[in-house]
C-alpha cells in the first residue's frame, strides 16, 4: 500500500507536473531543442500511461512492481539517461512511420462512424423524448377531465347504476339465482300447490265480478223518459167538427 502511494506521487510530480512546467518554459523561450525534447517525452509518456492502466490490473501482485515503475519514470526523465529520447528514436518513431497511413485511415473511419452513431442515437433520443412528452400531456388532459366531474355527476352515475336493482316500490330486486330458488321452493310446497289448484276459478269469478262491477258504471247511461203517445182517435175527434144532421131539421 505504501509503495503504491509513493509510486503515484512520483508519477504525478516527476512524471507530469515537472515536464509540464518545462514544456511551458520551452514554448515561452522558443527553444527548438527543448521543444523537441519535451515533445518526445510526452509521446513516450502517453504510451507509458496507457500500458500502466493495464499492468496495474494484471501485474500489481508482482513483487517490486511499484518500485520498478518509479525507477522507470525516473529513467525517462533523467537528463543523464535520456530514456524518453532513446525509446522514441529506437521504437516509437519507426513504428509510427510504418503504420502512419493505416492509423490515419482508422482514425477517419472511427470519426465517420462515431458521427453517424451520434446522429442515430440523437434521433432516437429525440423521438423518445417527444413520445414521452405527448404521453405526459395526454395523461395530464385526462386527469384534468376526470377532476372536472362534479360530485353531482358522480352521484347521478351511481344512482343510474343502482336503478336496475330496485323495484318500483323501492325494494331491491332479487338476483336471478334467488328468484329461481324461490320458484322451486313454491313448487315443492304441497299446501301452496293445493291453494293454487283451488284458487284459479275463484279468482277468475272474483276477477270477473270485479271487472263487471268496474265496467257497469261505465256502460250505464241515463235513460230518458219517452213521451206518452196520445190515442189517434182523440186527435181525430178534436180536429174534425161535428156535423148537424139534416134529418132532424126537416122533422122539426
Curated annotation (Swiss-Prot):
Biased composition (Basic and acidic residues): 203-217
Entry's localization field: Membrane
Top-level taxon of the source organism: Eukaryota
Disordered: region residues: 165-252
Any Gene Ontology CC annotation: endoplasmic reticulum membrane
Topology within the bilayer: Multi-pass membrane protein
This protein's UniProt keywords: Disease variant, Hereditary spastic paraplegia, Membrane, Neurodegeneration, Phosphoprotein, Transmembrane, Transmembrane helix
Entry's Gene Ontology molecular function annotations: microtubule binding; taste receptor binding
UniProt key word Cell wall biogenesis/degradation: no
Sequence intervals crossing the membrane: 1-21, 35-55
GO biological process terms, semicolon-separated: endoplasmic reticulum tubular network organization; protein transport into membrane raft; regulation of intracellular transport; sensory perception of bitter taste; sensory perception of sweet taste
Main location: membrane
Tissue: Detected in brain, heart and skeletal muscle, and at low levels in placenta, kidney and pancreas. Expressed in circumvallate papillae.
Modified sites of kind Phosphoserine: 150
Keyword match Phosphoprotein: yes
Family as reported in the entry's similarity comment: Belongs to the DP1 family.
Quaternary context: Interacts with odorant receptor proteins.
Biological function: Required for endoplasmic reticulum (ER) network formation, shaping and remodeling. May enhance the cell surface expression of odorant receptors.
Record's disease association: Spastic paraplegia 72A, autosomal dominant: A form of spastic paraplegia, a neurodegenerative disorder characterized by a slow, gradual, progressive weakness and spasticity of the lower limbs. Rate of progression and the severity of symptoms are quite variable. Initial symptoms may include difficulty with balance, weakness and stiffness in the legs, muscle spasms, and dragging the toes when walking. In some forms of the disorder, bladder symptoms (such as incontinence) may appear, or the weakness and stiffness may spread to other parts of the body. Spastic paraplegia 72B, autosomal recessive: A form of spastic paraplegia, a neurodegenerative disorder characterized by a slow, gradual, progressive weakness and spasticity of the lower limbs. Rate of progression and the severity of symptoms are quite variable. Initial symptoms may include difficulty with balance, weakness and stiffness in the legs, muscle spasms, and dragging the toes when walking. In some forms of the disorder, bladder symptoms (such as incontinence) may appear, or the weakness and stiffness may spread to other parts of the body.
Protein name: Receptor expression-enhancing protein 2
Amino acid at each position: 500500500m505504501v509503495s503504491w502511494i509513493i509510486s503515484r506521487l512520483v508519477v504525478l510530480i516527476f512524471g507530469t507536473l515537472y515536464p509540464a512546467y518545462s514544456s511551458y518554459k520551452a514554448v515561452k523561450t522558443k527553444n527548438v531543442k527543448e521543444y523537441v525534447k519535451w515533445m518526445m517525452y510526452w509521446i513516450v509518456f502517453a504510451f507509458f500511461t496507457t500500458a500502466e492502466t493495464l499492468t496495474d490490473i494484471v501485474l500489481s501482485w508482482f513483487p517490486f512492481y511499484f518500485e520498478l515503475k518509479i525507477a522507470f519514470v525516473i529513467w525517462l526523465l533523467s537528463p543523464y539517461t535520456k530514456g524518453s529520447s532513446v525509446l522514441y528514436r529506437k521504437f516509437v518513431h519507426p513504428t509510427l512511420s510504418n503504420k502512419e497511413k493505416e492509423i490515419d485511415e482508422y482514425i477517419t473511419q472511427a470519426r465517420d462512424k462515431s458521427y453517424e452513431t451520434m446522429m442515430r442515437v440523437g434521433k432516437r433520443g429525440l423521438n423518445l423524448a417527444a413520445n414521452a412528452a405527448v404521453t405526459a400531456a395526454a395523461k395530464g388532459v385526462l386527469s384534468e377531465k376526470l377532476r372536472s366531474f362534479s360530485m353531482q355527476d358522480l352521484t347521478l352515475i351511481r344512482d343510474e347504476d343502482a336503478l336496475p336493482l330496485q323495484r318500483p316500490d323501492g325494494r331491491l330486486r332479487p338476483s336471478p339465482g334467488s328468484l329461481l330458488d324461490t320458484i322451486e321452493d313454491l313448487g315443492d310446497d304441497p299446501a301452496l300447490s293445493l291453494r293454487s289448484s283451488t284458487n284459479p276459478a275463484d279468482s277468475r269469478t272474483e276477477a270477473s265480478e270485479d271487472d263487471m262491477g268496474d265496467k257497469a258504471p261505465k256502460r250505464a247511461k241515463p235513460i230518458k223518459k219517452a213521451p206518452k203517445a196520445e190515442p189517434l182517435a182523440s186527435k181525430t175527434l178534436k180536429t174534425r167538427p161535428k156535423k148537424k144532421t139534416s134529418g132532424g131539421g126537416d122533422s122539426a
